[in-house]
A protein has these predicted regions:
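Short helix-perturbing small/polar motifs within transmembrane alpha-helices
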Residues: 2, 9-23, 108-152, 187
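Membrane-helix interfacial "entry" motifs
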Residues: 2-13, 48, 52, 68, ...
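Ordered, amphipathic secondary-structure segments that act as subunit-interaction surfaces
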Residues: 67-89
């Protein structure tokens, strides 16, 4: 399968989307707000509800929109990487407190987002036979579940503990559904955005 990389203009657009996404996420979800939303308001078990219902879907919108605004591959990777790096830089430079359970802004956080972005790129590439909206939804669902599994197996055991097996099916189902919805939302956002930016 031949892989065509994005051009310089598309790379800059993806980088800007990643930076804007990081700024929005940083100020929309200050310390403790995600845990409060998913556990106290929605009453969901954890750990992982915040990843599957908030962080993952937000990243999916950033990554998939960037991918759709690019003719070649690499948009999702650049946008996701910029999201993670800029988020980490702002948190460390301005000493902004974050929830240590999710290690937001740490090297583990950046590594998890990089894996997420690689999975997103692969899902978008492998789903080319599907219609565009289903391709985006497939990407969102797969990437969101992968991000959640990374947190369950690598990050949460270090910070808060292992997920209970009885809670895993519910969270995976919600994670998958939110990934599908986020992919669809990203597809919808990209259509007017691509016309406004005159990229395609």
């Amino acid at each position: 399968m031949k892989i065509t990389l994005i051009c310089e203009k598309e790379a800059r657009t993806s980088a800007v989307l990643g930076v804007v996404g990081a700024l929005i996420f940083l100020f929309a979800f200050p310390k403790g707000s995600i845990s409060t939303l998913v556990h106290e308001v929605l009453g969901l078990p954890g750990p992982g509800a915040g990843i599957g219902l908030v962080l993952g879907p937000f990243l999916i919108v950033v990554a998939v929109v960037s991918s759709l605004l690019s003719r070649g591959s690499g948009g999702a990777l650049i946008a996701s990487l910029m999201f993670a790096v800029v988020y980490a830089l702002i948190v460390h430079l301005f000493k902004i407190p974050t929830n240590q359970k999710g290690v937001f802004g740490s090297s583990l956080f950046i590594a998890a987002v990089i894996v997420f972005s690689v999975v997103s790129e692969a899902a978008m590439a492998l789903g080319k036979r599907l219609s565009m909206v289903w391709r985006c939804m497939l990407c969102g669902a797969v990437a969101n579940v992968v991000l959640l599994v990374i947190y369950w197996t690598v990050i949460f055991p270090r910070t808060t503990g292992w997920i209970r097996w009885s809670d895993a099916p519910v969270l995976i189902g919600l994670c998958f559904a939110c990934g599908l919805a986020s992919g669809c939302i990203a597809w919808g956002i990209s259509r007017p955005l691509s016309k406004a930016l005159a990229i395609k």
